Swiss-Prot record:
Pfam families: Na_H_antiport_1. Its main location: membrane. It is found in: Cell inner membrane. One of its GO terms (cellular component) is plasma membrane. GO terms for biological process: regulation of pH. It catalyses: Na(+)(in) + 2 H(+)(out) = Na(+)(out) + 2 H(+)(in). Keywords: Antiport, Cell inner membrane, Cell membrane, Ion transport, Membrane, Sodium, Sodium transport, Transmembrane, Transmembrane helix, Transport. Na(+)/H(+) antiporter that extrudes sodium in exchange for external protons. It is a multi-pass membrane protein. This is Na(+)/H(+) antiporter NhaA. It comes from Yersinia pseudotuberculosis serotype O:1b (strain IP 31758).
Length: 394
């Protein structure tokens, strides 16, 4: 394993713990006398005005749409490296997380509809348990440090990216009231320019980031989830140049400390503050939250593991190197952490309806995601090899 990957794993082990602590602090603040301070912090208005461009959003949305685009940029860089020359290199290995992600979206949605399909209003939330919160899932996995094989972590990253792309498409098709075709057109032109730069072997990272910033603004203005820009830019930055430099690896190395120690903990703090005020036991056990929780905790692993197993047995795909099905199952449970992406879909699905629907949706998401995190972490501890000890070379 290269030095950069070793450092990457060390950073995430510490960063994962910080992320969990940040989430716990947010949950405590949202359900205490500090709730007002917590909400005021998230509502701080932040505006950027450059000529005719005017973007004004509360701090929460800058964190979710802006800082998280940087996180997805790093994820895109790593997944591209593994697809090109790592554990996912080759068509039969690359298709494996795609098939798993498909199962991980279908099964939770079907289970949710078993609970809520008869109700015309709650039926609209069918996509809520289809999402995976890549940041929280990665943070929980990172608690196990270097026990996690690189291939398994990359499988989670690739699966979660495909899952997120699927959810973004679902949001655009079913939950977006208005899409700006003009902004999407400019975004398409920016993507074409990035692809051309990659084809010509442009090695200046700053050039990709500048075009990527334009792409981010256009996707944000279009009404589609802006973090998609980060993944696209990550895939377009060259892995190697003709002079044997690696712009991709250099950028990944530079951004990782910021992502692990600042962006992800801040994201967790901003999104984990779910208020439990006014919650009743009867409401908590109603069909809406139970459908969501069951979809996340049961549907996710059922869909991911079943589709993965069938793909391998039918010869459609191959397991990543040094990975077994016990580990795949543990990761599939971890993918039941829907959290922020699920909350985002719930806010769209029940917009303009009874506020109680959104509240109990969030509680179902919290219940399912927390259960998936605890059980997924416990299973990973059982199925992963013992912690590797550092060897001093004299």
């Amino acid at each position: 394993m290269t030095n950069i990957i070793r450092q990457f794993l060390r950073q995430e082990a510490a960063g994962g713990l910080i992320l969990i602590i940040a989430a716990a602090i947010a949950l405590l603040m949202a359900n205490s006398a500090l709730q007002g301070i917590y909400q005021s912090f998230l509502d701080i208005p932040v505006s950027i005005k450059i000529a005719s461009l005017d973007i004004s959003k509360p701090l929460l949305l800058w964190i979710n749409d802006g800082l998280m685009a940087v996180f997805f940029l790093v994820v895109g860089l790593e997944v591209k490296r593994e697809l090109m020359e790592g554990s996912l290199a080759g068509r039969d290995k690359a298709v494996f997380p795609a098939i798993a992600a498909l199962g991980g979206m279908l099964a939770p949605a079907l289970i949710y509809l078993l609970f809520n399909g008869a109700d015309e209003v709650t039926r609209q939330g069918w996509a809520i348990p289809a999402a995976t919160d890549i940041a929280f899932a990665l943070g929980v996995m990172a608690l196990l440090g270097n026990r996690v094989p690189t291939g398994l972590k990359v499988f989670l990253l690739a699966l979660a990216i495909i899952d997120d792309l699927g959810v973004i498409i679902i949001i655009a098709l079913f939950y977006t009231q208005q899409v700006s075709l003009q902004s999407l057109g400019i975004a398409a032109a920016a993507i074409a320019l990035l692809a051309y730069m990659n084809w010509r072997g442009v090695g200046k990272t700053s050039a990709y980031l500048l075009v990527g910033l334009v792409l981010w603004v256009c996707i944000l203005k279009s009404g589609v989830h802006a973090t998609l820009a980060g993944v696209i830019v990550g895939f377009m930055i060259p892995l190697h140049t003709q002079d044997q430099r690696s712009p991709s690896e250099s950028l990944e190395h530079g951004l990782h400390p910021w992502v692990a120690y600042l962006i992800l903990p801040l994201f967790a703090f901003a999104n984990a503050g779910v208020s439990l005020q006014g919650v009743s036991l009867s409401g908590l056990t109603s069909l809406l939250p139970m459908g969501i929780a069951t979809g996340l905790f049961i549907g996710k692993p059922l869909g991911i593991f079943t589709f993965s197993w069938l793909a391998v047995k039918l010869g459609i795909a191959k397991l990543p190197d040094a990975i077994n099905f016990k580990q795949i199952f543990a990761v599939s449970v971890l993918c039941g952490i829907g959290f922020t992406m699920s909350i985002f879909i719930a806010s769209l699905a029940f917009e303009g309806t009874d506020i109680a629907l959104t509240t109990y949706s969030k509680l179902g998401i919290l219940l399912g995601s927390t259960t998936a995190a605890v059980v997924g972490y416990s299973l990973l501890r059982l199925v992963l090899p013992a912690r590797r000890k550092a060897v001093n070379v004299r």
